[in-house]
A protein has these predicted regions:
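Conserved ABC ATPase signature
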Residues: 148-153, 157, 417-421, 425
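ABC ATPase "signature
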Residues: 231-235, 243, 499-503, 511
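A short, proline-enriched helix->beta-strand linker immediately N-terminal to the Walker B motif
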Residues: 168-172, 436-440
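A short, surface-exposed alpha-helical micro-motif characterized by mixed small hydrophobic
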Residues: 216-218, 484-486
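Conserved ABC transporter NBD signature motif
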Residues: 62-73, 336-344
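Conserved ABC ATPase "signature" region
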Residues: 125-144, 344, 394-412, 522
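ABC ATPase NBD coupling module
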Residues: 74-91, 109, 117, 123, ...
Length: 531
């Protein structure tokens, strides 16, 4: 029986005299007990389509076509009808729970609001229902978490709270909009397992929105592939993956980062190395703020990376990956030995460090956050030249044009601002800013995790080309093991500040030695969690 029927849906946004066609002629069905995946890249219209189901769109949106839920027409329905469907019959889980949960309210208060509004429960019955929901979504010691605020929970726990909120009123249809994109692979696998269990136990249907085809293969019964506001292909999941018909679907499936790093010459010089590196943060307690212990962010890490070589550092959030890289660049204090191009940088003062700074650069995860919105591309890319090559007679504009061309951007765009570019283009700008100084070591801190899979593959190819051309040493931080395998020569696995495994990429992937590494690999490549 058809639960949700979307027929010839069109969504336009009008601003002044400009009309943007966000969704065009979209049609699909969700049957009872079925999971349908809407797949596509950023801007394809996936989320707009989902939000249209219960008209959660801004006033500037104009809907046409038909959306029926259990036979009831929702396009043009009154607010009273839509309120009855929202939360009760159709619930949403969004990508980033930190922005969906109110930071000023406890978990109990936020869950109680929905239960009291839709179910009419009061007093102890509400608390009992909340504890039951938190238990169902796998939050341990649920009663003690009722007084917690969102910032006191991990990313995975916050997403579980969002799922509990969505399930509070027993919906028949759950719409999940990229619910695992911001999570580590092991947590991602746990959330997917949880959603599958809840769907089965509650006989619920699910509309799952994602750009990650690994998730689609695991969770969906049918797939709708979206591009530029249209569904270009639809069919059973197995059929779509085994025999994709549309060129765009074929490109999406082939877009995973692939290949392997080029061999490193035996005589390649060591660019950076550490020995027994520690970063411990003291825990201060009491009136006199005495040290009661330490948070061991990084504990006795030893590594080497040579010219032309990539060291991949993997692990979940909080494992110490980024902290280790920051210490190697001497951006935070540490103990132990750090050598950069033969210099023990612990022995250098700030003035002595400055000439080395241009040789070590970093590319961050979110280019929108790391690029100044008030600076043009030209100003952003030349900033390093202004600091490290001030006084030199150089044609900065030509250098910017050359490096933009090298990273695959049109130099004619250098007068534009970051907001005028896509996510992939912004990351290319960040790479250009790092590369214009011709560094010897580049730290890449999750540079592809915020990007669509096709753009991920392009950035990996670009980084590989630049490395081969200039003999760059990379420290590549990621929780995406597929990208690590495509780009890295060696890898380290970190957990709670400790290096639990290290070796060549082939050795670690083909013959992992620790249970934790095996769990990471299973979560990344099989989409399953290991208890």
């Amino acid at each position: 029986m058809t639960l949700l029927n979307v027929s010839n849906l069109t969504v336009d946004f009008r601003q002044d005299s400009v009309t943007t066609h966000a969704v065009r002629g979209v049609s699909f069905k969700v049957e009872k007990g079925e999971t349908v995946a809407l797949v596509g890249e950023s801007g394809s219209g996936k989320s707009i389509t989902a939000l249209s189901t219960v008209n959660l769109l801004p006033d500037s949106a104009q809907l046409a076509g038909s959306i029926t839920y259990n036979g009831q027409e929702l396009v043009g329905a009154s607010d009273k009808v839509l309120r009855g469907v929202r939360g009760n019959d159709i619930s949403f889980i969004f990508q980033e729970p930190m922005t969906s949960l109110n930071p000023l309210h406890t978990i109990e208060k936020q869950l109680a609001e929905s239960i009291e509004l839709h179910q009419g429960l009061r007093g102890p019955a509400v608390r009992e229902r909340i504890v039951d929901l938190l238990d169902r979504v796998g939050i341990r010691d649920a009663e003690s978490r009722l007084t917690s605020y969102p910032h006191e929970l991990s990313g995975g726990q916050r997403q579980r709270v969002m799922i509990a909120m969505a399930l509070a009123n027993g919906p028949e249809l759950l719409i999940a909009d990229e619910p695992t994109t911001a999570l580590d692979v092991t947590i991602q696998a746990q959330i997917l397992d949880l959603l599958e269990d809840l769907k089965r136990d509650s006989a619920m249907s699910m509309l799952f929105i994602t750009h990650d085809l690994t998730i689609v293969r695991k969770i969906a019964d049918r797939v709708c592939v979206m591009k530029d506001g249209e569904i270009v292909e639809t069919g059973p999941t197995d059929q779509i993956f085994a025999n994709p018909q549309h060129p765009y679907t074929q490109m999406l499936i082939a877009a995973e980062a692939s290949g392997q790093a080029a061999p490193v010459p035996d005589d390649a010089p060591v660019m950076a190395e550490t020995e027994n590196l520690r970063i411990w943060f003291p825990i201060k307690r009491g009136l006199l703020r005495r040290t009661a212990g330490y948070v061991k962010a990084v504990n006795d890490a030893t590594l080497t990376v040579r010219a032309g070589e990539t060291l991949g550092i993997v692990g979940e959030s909080g494992s110490g990956k980024t902290t280790l890289a920051m210490a190697i660049m001497r951006l935070i204090n540490s103990t132990g030995r750090i050598a950069f191009v033969g210099n023990d940088i612990h022995e250098l003062n700030q003035k002595q460090m400055r000439p080395l700074r241009s040789d070590m650069q970093i590319v961050f995860q979110d280019p929108f956050g790391s690029l100044s919105p008030r600076m043009t591309v030209e100003q952003i890319v030349t900033e390093g030249l202004d600091i490290h090559r001030a006084g030199e007679k150089i044609d900065k504009k030509q250098l910017v044009a050359d490096i933009l061309t090298e990273v695959g951007l049109d130099p004619a765009l250098m007068s534009r601002y970051p907001h005028e570019f896509s996510g992939g283009q912004r990351q290319r700008i960040a790479i250009a800013r790092a590369m214009i100084l011709r560094p010897k070591l580049v730290v890449l801190d999750e540079p592809t995790s915020a990007l669509d899979m096709t753009v991920q593959a392009q950035i990996v190819d670009l980084l590989r080309d630049l490395q081969q051309k200039y003999g760059l040493a990379y420290i590549f931080i990621s929780h995406d093991l597929k990208v690590v395998r495509a780009l890295s020569h060696k890898m380290m696995v970190m957990r709670a500040g400790d290096v639990v495994e290290a070796g060549s990429v082939a050795d670690v992937f083909d013959n992992p030695q620790t249970d934790y590494t095996r769990e990471l690999l299973a979560a990344a490549f099989e989409g399953r969690s290991i208890a």
